[in-house]
């Protein structure tokens, strides 16, 4: 799956480049796959669980897990809303803006996995999660996100409105 390919990519790149390896727009760029394949919440959750566990296992790449980060847009960014979505290198007949429902599925599934922790209930070391805040952020309906904040102190919150953060995370 795409999530397993991302794990392999991060594992390989940690041996080639220094510092954190990051996937910017993690949610925005993944949701077209959910939309196209009509994935259920359970299927999305299983894929993200595989991704999270995969990047926290140091096998194959030496002595440490890949130092990795993902950035979440939470809402489809303006620069993507009217762009045709790309799945498997092909332009789709829908836009990224058509995938906001799938964004909610991805976020709920991701933070459900994060909140469960590992088999012992411990939090995951990676990925470091950064979340872009914007004026459209729904502070009242993000239960899984705020559970993660309370339990593990993740994610980091960033705002594009007050500073230029584009160069920080790829």
Which sequence ranges carry the predicted segments?
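Conserved catalytic cores of very large enzyme subunits
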Residues: 1-170
């Amino acid at each position: 799956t795409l999530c397993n390919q991302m794990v392999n990519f991060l594992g390989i790149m940690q041996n080639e480049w220094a510092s954190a390896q990051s996937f910017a727009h993690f949610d925005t760029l993944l949701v077209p796959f959910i939309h196209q394949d009509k994935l259920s919440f359970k299927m999305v959750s299983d894929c993200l669980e595989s991704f999270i566990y995969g990047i926290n296992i140091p096998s194959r790449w030496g002595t440490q897990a890949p130092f990795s980060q993902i950035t979440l847009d939470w809402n489809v960014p303006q620069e993507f809303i009217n762009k045709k979505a790309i799945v498997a290198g092909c332009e789709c007949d829908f836009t990224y803006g058509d995938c906001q429902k799938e964004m909610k599925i991805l976020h709920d599934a991701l933070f459900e996995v994060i909140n469960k922790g590992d088999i012992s209930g411990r939090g995951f070391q990676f990925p470091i999660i950064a979340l872009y805040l914007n004026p459209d952020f729904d502070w009242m309906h993000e239960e899984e996100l705020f559970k993660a904040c309370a339990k593990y102190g993740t994610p980091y919150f960033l705002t594009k409105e007050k500073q230029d953060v584009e160069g920080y995370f790829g």
